[in-house]
Structures are given as structure tokens and as C-alpha cells.
């Protein structure tokens, strides 16, 4: 097979990549919302926030997205979704197989790929290989005002390198079971009054409902979504059923959108 391929030398390759990357960072250094973690709740939140017209930046420490979706259930490649979360998956064109009324099985690879694509298509920016290791805070009034970020590879190499800062009107902790961002804020800014109760063992039926109900603001400018909610609020885990995860992402997006709208009205 003969193919005429455009010739691009190494200098152009490097220049174009550096230029476009720096333009993205320059644009998003001041964001409306920073989401930490590109798992199911983080991607769902990113999708709805970007759809609402908010400048939405997602940091993911790994080189892929999906969080716990990719591992499926003990590496089985299927997951469970229940009503009404199926409406979100249908919205992003994930195929569902109904196994009983209101209960669906989905393919893990399709689920995470289409949810991420939907968030990107809506306008969210996802940057891989970046770890959030601290927050920015302000006083009068006391609030979280952004994050400090570092390359994951730098942290893995145990190099002493200062981070850079990203400003945000709202920060969402979607880091999962450890609620990493909220944990740092609770430890380093005790004035925020955050108490982390710790996640409980499995009780799927209750966990799904309680996670969505308790999703939202934990301090001014700082929000919890997904499994971070269970860690902060002392709720049970639910295992490989993901309805609450995407519903939590949607719920936190709706709350942030309302909060930022109120803030704009006041100013």
C-alpha cells in the first residue's frame, strides 16, 4: 500500500506540542471549577458543569480516565447501573442491558470512554499525569479558592519541586475512597471545620442513596462527589454498582452551578 504522508520534522513536532500545551495551561490557570479525579463522579460532574457553560478543568493523576470503572468488578468487565442513573448513561450513548426492572449491566470500557468523551465534547478540559497535593485558601470570608498541582511523575520520583497554582471558584474532590483533597484541607486549614468520619464497610442499598443525598459542599469553595462523600460523611461503600457515582457527579454540578450563579448575582 502506497501512502503519501505529510512530512513533519522533530522541531515542528516539539514546537506545536509545547505551544498548544502552554496555551491550555495559560487559559485554565484561572478556572470556574477544578475537579480532582477523572473517575465516574468526576467525569459526570465535568460533563454537566461544562454543559452549563462553566470553565471546567479536570486533573487526573494517572495517564487514563475512568477511575474505578476500568477495573470493573474484581476485573470482570461488567458493572451495574440502576434507575434513575440509567438516564445519564443514555444521554451519553452508553448501551445498557436490562437484567431486571430498573437494573442494568454495562460494559466498563464503553462506560468510561463515552462518559469521558461526553465531558470533553461539552467543553471540559482533562489533563492527565497531574496530582493535586494542596489547596489555595482565602480569608474574609474563609474559603477554598483553588489548588496546587504537581506532575505525578515528579512526586513518584520524590523530587523536591514546588507546585504551580490553579485558581477556581469551586473545587470538587472526586478522588475516591481517600477524599485526598478534602483530607488535606481538613488537616492544614482547621478553621474550615471539616470533620472526616471515615468510610464504612459495604451496605450497597443504603450506600447508593446516602451518597447522592450527602453529595455537595463541605466548606466554602470545596465540594465532595462520589466515594469522597462516603469517606467524609462516614457512609458505607457499595462496590461495583455505579449509579450513585454518576448521580453524585450530576448533583454536585447542579449545586455548584446554582452557587456560582448566586455569587454572580451578589457581585
Curated annotation (Swiss-Prot):
Keyword check for Repeat: no
Cleavable signal peptide: none
Catalysed reactions, semicolon-separated: hydrogen sulfide + glycine + NAD(+) = ADP-5-ethyl-4-methylthiazole-2-carboxylate + nicotinamide + 3 H2O + H(+)
Highest taxon, organism lineage: Archaea
Binding site for glycine: 237
UniProt-listed Pfam families: Thi4 (PF01946)
UniProt: NAD(+) binding residues: 41, 60-61, 68, 132, 160-162, 227
InterPro entries named among the record's database cross-references: FAD/NAD-bd_sf, Thi4_fam, Thi4_prok
Entry binding sites for Fe cation: 162, 177
Keywords of this entry: Iron, Metal-binding, NAD, Thiamine biosynthesis, Transferase
Pathway participation: Cofactor biosynthesis; thiamine diphosphate biosynthesis
Alphabetical GO biological process terms: thiamine biosynthetic process; thiamine diphosphate biosynthetic process; thiazole biosynthetic process
GO molecular function: iron ion binding; pentosyltransferase activity
Enzyme class: transferase
Protein family according to the UniProt entry: Belongs to the THI4 family.
PANTHER family the record matches: THIAMINE THIAZOLE SYNTHASE
Primary role: Involved in the biosynthesis of the thiazole moiety of thiamine. Catalyzes the conversion of NAD and glycine to adenosine diphosphate 5-(2-hydroxyethyl)-4-methylthiazole-2-carboxylate (ADT), an adenylated thiazole intermediate, using free sulfide as a source of sulfur.
Protein name: Thiamine thiazole synthase
Gene name, Swiss-Prot/TrEMBL: thi4
Amino acid at each position: 500500500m502506497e501512502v503519501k504522508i505529510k512530512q513533519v520534522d522533530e522541531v515542528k513536532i516539539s514546537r506545536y506540542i509545547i505551544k498548544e500545551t502552554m496555551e491550555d495551561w495559560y487559559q485554565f490557570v484561572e478556572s470556574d471549577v477544578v475537579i480532582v479525579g477523572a473517575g465516574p463522579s468526576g467525569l459526570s460532574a465535568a460533563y454537566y458543569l461544562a454543559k452549563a457553560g462553566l470553565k471546567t478543568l479536570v486533573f487526573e493523576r494517572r495517564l487514563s480516565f475512568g477511575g474505578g470503572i476500568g477495573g470493573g468488578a474484581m476485573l470482570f468487565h461488567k458493572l451495574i447501573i440502576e434507575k434513575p442513573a440509567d438516564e445519564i448513561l443514555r444521554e451519553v450513548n452508553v448501551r445498557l442491558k436490562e437484567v431486571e426492572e430498573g437494573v442494568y449491566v454495562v460494559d466498563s470500557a464503553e462506560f468510561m470512554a463515552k462518559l469521558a468523551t461526553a465531558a470533553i465534547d461539552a467543553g471540559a478540559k482533562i489533563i492527565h499525569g497531574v496530582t493535586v497535593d494542596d489547596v489555595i485558601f482565602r480569608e474574609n470570608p474563609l474559603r477554598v479558592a483553588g489548588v496546587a498541582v504537581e506532575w505525578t511523575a515528579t512526586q513518584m520520583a520524590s523530587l523536591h519541586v514546588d507546585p504551580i497554582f490553579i485558581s477556581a471558584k469551586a473545587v470538587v474532590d472526586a478522588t475516591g475512597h481517600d477524599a485526598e483533597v478534602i483530607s488535606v484541607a481538613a488537616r492544614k486549614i482547621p478553621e474550615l471545620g471539616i470533620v472526616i468520619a471515615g468510610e464504612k464497610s459495604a451496605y450497597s442499598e443504603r450506600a447508593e442513596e446516602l451518597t447522592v443525598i450527602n453529595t455537595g459542599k463541605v466548606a466554602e469553595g470545596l465540594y465532595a462527589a462520589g466515594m469522597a462523600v462516603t469517606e467524609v460523611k462516614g457512609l458505607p461503600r457499595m462496590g461495583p454498582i455505579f449509579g450513585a457515582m454518576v448521580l453524585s457527579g450530576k448533583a454536585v454540578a447542579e449545586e455548584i452551578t446554582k452557587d456560582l450563579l448566586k455569587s454572580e448575582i451578589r457581585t
